[in-house]
């Protein structure tokens, strides 16, 4: 469950290392983001020579949360960290690699490129 001011790790090679959530997309009263939701975030830490720089405002999709997500069969999927992938306006990732596992819920929300690049889909 991600909200405004939450910090997330970046799970791609776009150059950013840490994000600060500014806004959850989807209406003015929307408070929390779960797996597969889009957020607006600020880059708080970045590697030199990356595509994105520290201070850039980017859109990202949440791929892992500590809170997890409930599935239709009643099971839950949870992760050890909150992580996101920086995306372009066409919902494709800015980076060319995805690090760590991603949840199956991303496939249902049409983030096919992220799912295909991920090393593991849980």
Curated annotation (Swiss-Prot):
GO biological process: translation
A GO MF term: structural constituent of ribosome
UniProt similarity note: Belongs to the universal ribosomal protein uL14 family.
Keyword Cell division tagged: no
Descriptive protein name: Large ribosomal subunit protein uL14
InterPro entries: Ribosomal_uL14, Ribosomal_uL14_bac-type, Ribosomal_uL14_CS, Ribosomal_uL14_sf
Quaternary structure and partners: Part of the 50S ribosomal subunit. Forms a cluster with proteins L3 and L19. In the 70S ribosome, L14 and L19 interact and together make contacts with the 16S rRNA in bridges B5 and B8.
Keyword Cytoplasm applies: no
Keywords: Ribonucleoprotein, Ribosomal protein, RNA-binding, rRNA-binding
Taxonomic classification: Bacteria, Bacillati, Bacillota, Clostridia, Lachnospirales
CDD domains on file: Ribosomal_uL14
Gene3D superfamilies noted in UniProt: Ribosomal protein L14
Native species: Lachnoclostridium phytofermentans (strain ATCC 700394 / DSM 18823 / ISDg) (Clostridium phytofermentans)
Function field: Binds to 23S rRNA. Forms part of two intersubunit bridges in the 70S ribosome.
Gene Ontology CC: one annotated term: cytosolic large ribosomal subunit
Pfam families named in the record: Ribosomal_L14
